[in-house]
């Protein structure tokens, strides 16, 4: 699915299931960016993306550039969340092993972002790259769980906000976090 979304108070739900190639993005992550207005542009939007592979061929990808404020974005690849007030992305079904990639670029404030990457079997990796620039009080909750390597790269260039990151079980764990801003940013890494 390749898309751009403009406007205020939109709701977008994408649910992808299958054995290969689940992708929600604009072309090559930073494709058009809708003339730099962002792939998602407009305030107060609710975006929910759920990707499930049922005995993998290693592809779950999500990539967006968001230029607007006060959005709720939930990205669930295979399963997880459980907290920053979960909106039920549990799962942990048998035989789910997609390779999970999230690339998210926020140039805005007051966004609530929840991301989950889980592999129930197999040895697929998890990769998340998150940037927040300009705008304040972005809250990000990320959980990577089970099998394969877990790589998380986060750059926070905003004031305030809470960042909660969890990497669990199996494989090598790497988290690179770069924080900069005038006011506090709460960070929890487990």
Outline where the language-model segments fall.
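Low-complexity repeat regions of mature extracellularly deployed or surface/particle-associated proteins
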Residues: 1-190
């Amino acid at each position: 699915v390749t898309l751009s979304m403009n406007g205020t108070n939109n709701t977008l739900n994408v649910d992808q299931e299958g054995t290969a190639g689940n992708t929600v993005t604009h072309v090559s992550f930073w494709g058009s960016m809708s003339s730099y207005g962002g792939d998602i542009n407009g305030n107060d939007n609710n975006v929910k993306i759920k990707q499930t592979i049922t005995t993998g061929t290693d592809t779950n990808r999500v990539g967006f550039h968001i230029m607007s404020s006060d959005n709720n974005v939930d990205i669930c690849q295979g399963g997880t969340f459980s907290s920053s007030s979960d909106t039920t992305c549990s799962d942990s079904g048998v035989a789910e092993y997609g390779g999970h990639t999230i690339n998210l670029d926020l140039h805005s404030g007051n966004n609530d972002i929840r991301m989950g990457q889980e592999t129930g079997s197999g040895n697929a990796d998890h990769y998340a790259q998150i940037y927040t620039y300009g705008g304040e009080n972005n809250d990000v909750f990320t959980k990577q769980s089970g099998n394969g390597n877990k790589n998380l790269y986060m750059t926070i260039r905003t004031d305030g906000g809470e960042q909660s990151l969890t990497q669990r079980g199996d494989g090598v764990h790497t988290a690179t976090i770069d924080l900069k801003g005038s006011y506090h940013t709460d960070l929890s890494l487990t």
